[in-house]
Every structure is written in structure tokens, then in C-alpha cells.
């Protein structure tokens, strides 16, 4: 997202929170949410986006949590499962789920970035 010159005009910060500890400490994801739903869940994505918005001076925040692969999947949460959430002003919060399948780690990551940018664009127009 920051490869384009001038991106600092619209990107205030980015957080990478792979561990549950980072999700709790940096984004305020509740330990109860992680215990009940796991890191890869709609509930966690929603709390991540809301926490990112609170932790910044931004108008919008997007969160992604998923299983890019090649390992780490399960029957319930297979490789390619990704949850997204976009938070905006006035408690506006939209979440979606995508199941990309086993298309390769790089392809899952790229598709996830595209989806996140589409969510941000839609939220900016709303």
C-alpha cells in the first residue's frame, strides 16, 4: 500500500499482529474473544479493526486475519480462509469472509490485500 509516492497522505500507520499477544496488546482484542473464537474469526477481525481505529488518528481501519498456508489449516478453518473487517466513524463496522482455497500463500496474501483495499475504497465512498 505504501509503494506509491504520496501514500503517506492517506496511510497513517500499519500494525502487524501475528500473535494473540500482539492482538491483545496493540489492538485491544479481548482474551475471551480469542479463547472463544480463535485468532482466525469474524469476531477477532471486528475487534482488530475497531482497535486499529482507536489506536490511530485515521478515519478508517481495515483488519485481516486468516490462514494463508501452506500449513496451519484445519477442517474448521482451512487454508485460504480469511476474515476481513473495516471500521469507520460512528461505530460503522463491516466484516466479510473469503475462502480462497489452497491457491498458494502468495496468492492468498495478494487476494487479501485486494479485498482489503476494496473494503477501504467502499467505506471511503460511504
Name the predicted role of every residue range.
Residues 2-126:
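Short alpha-helical segments enriched in small residues
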Amino acid at each position: 500500500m505504501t509503494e506509491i509516492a504520496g501514500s503517506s497522505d492517506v496511510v497513517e500507520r500499519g500494525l502487524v499482529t501475528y500473535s494473540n499477544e500482539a492482538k491483545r496488546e496493540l489492538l485491544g482484542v479481548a482474551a475471551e474473544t480469542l479463547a472463544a473464537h480463535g485468532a482466525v474469526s469474524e469476531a477477532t477481525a471486528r475487534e482488530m479493526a475497531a482497535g486499529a481505529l482507536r489506536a490511530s488518528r485515521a478515519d478508517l481501519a481495515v483488519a485481516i486475519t486468516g490462514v494463508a498456508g501452506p500449513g496451519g489449516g484445519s477442517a474448521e478453518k482451512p487454508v485460504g480462509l480469511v476474515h476481513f473487517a473495516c471500521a469507520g466513524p460512528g461505530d460503522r463496522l463491516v466484516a466479510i469472509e473469503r475462502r480462497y482455497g489452497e491457491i498458494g500463500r502468495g496468492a492468498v496474501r495478494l487476494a487479501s490485500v485486494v479485498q482489503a483495499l476494496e473494503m477501504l475504497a467502499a467505506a471511503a465512498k460511504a
